[in-house]
Amino acid sequence: PVVPLAMSDHPASVTFRTIGGEGDRPVSYSYGYANTGFVSAGERVYDSAYFKRIPAYLKKMAGGTDSISKLVEADKTLYVQGEVKDKPFTFNGIPMPTPFDKEQPAAQQFTPHAKKNYLVETVIADTWVMNVYEVSATGERKTIGVPKKDAGAN
């Protein structure tokens, strides 16, 4: 479940999640504004169904989490990106490029509004896709992110 953080009048709440990939493909999320560059959102984010199944001592050793929530500034374009950790194909211990190498999910941008909740979710499947949703109080999702433009201005 998306757990919104308590908000004052100004910030918006963003939750980062991963679906699929089991334990092999956690996603490292980062976010930032046009003039600040990206900062890490925190630990690697694993698929929540997978994360619930692994024993606590392994979680402590390996680190990671099944979701991260952050408060972000409202009415400023926010950029989000996720980097999927992939296991390279090796031949006799030598990493080899393969035609199956996946593209990292495209970075997204959106403008959060005060007191709203947003979900940044990467789905690990045949392709890796990251989407941004605005989540209503009733849990309905509306897709709002667009691929990040090179220009920082809207």
Briefly describe each language-model feature range.
Residues P1-N154:
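Short loop/turn and low-complexity linker motifs enriched in small/turn-promoting residues
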